[in-house]
């Protein structure tokens, strides 16, 4: 059905967005990137289009290229909370520029202090900085706002383990398994439990 619509309106931005999102949902990031390139050639493309293009680049391992685009977005709009969060979380995952990651996520939380995803990122940045007590505080708050997020729950379990709170860690990991759908992630969580 979607492909039929695309054949009828191949240059319609709304249709192209739907197609790009379809490919992204199927983890076909390269096709999604090609479509976002077409969208970005349009004079009416938005910052959101650039964000989605950059996040797809990141998904195929082109973090350095994506990072340049994310910083361009932040230069244009320093209060773009989603970009601040994305970059902060990615820096934490890569364990690089943790001071900058902390600065960015704190800025996002000043704008949206009750955002569970942002609190998770702050918790994860603190975890990577080995500030485990601080990390637990933010991760517990994040879990209270996102009680079915397997990723956030898993992060909390990891943090409990670092604080030698093994029983609580296992409890959180078992809870995370209830909500996790990705098979590879399920295997990783089960390995932690065992």
Q: Which role does the model predict for each range below?
A:
Residues 21, 55, 89-90, 124, ...:
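Residue-level recognition of tetratricopeptide repeat
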């Amino acid at each position: 059905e979607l492909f039929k619509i695309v054949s009828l309106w191949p240059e319609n931005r709304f249709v192209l967005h739907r197609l790009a999102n379809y490919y992204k949902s199927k983890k076909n990031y390269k096709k999604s990137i090609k479509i976002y390139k077409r969208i970005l050639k349009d004079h009416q493309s938005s910052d959101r289009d650039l964000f989605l293009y950059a996040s797809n680049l990141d998904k195929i391992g082109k973090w350095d290229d994506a990072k340049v685009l994310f910083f361009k977005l932040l230069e244009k709009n320093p209060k773009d909370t989603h970009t601040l969060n994305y970059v902060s979380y990615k820096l934490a995952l890569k364990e690089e520029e943790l001071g900058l990651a902390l600065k960015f996520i704190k800025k996002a939380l000043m704008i949206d202090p009750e955002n569970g995803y942002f609190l998770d990122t702050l918790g994860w940045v603190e975890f990577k900085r080995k500030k485990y007590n601080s990390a637990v505080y933010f991760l517990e708050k994040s879990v209270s706002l996102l009680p079915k997020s397997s990723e956030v729950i898993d992060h909390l379990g990891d943090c409990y383990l670092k604080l030698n709170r093994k029983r609580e860690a296992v409890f959180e990991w078992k809870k995370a398994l209830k909500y996790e759908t990705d098979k590879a992630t399920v295997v990783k969580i089960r390995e932690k439990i065992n």
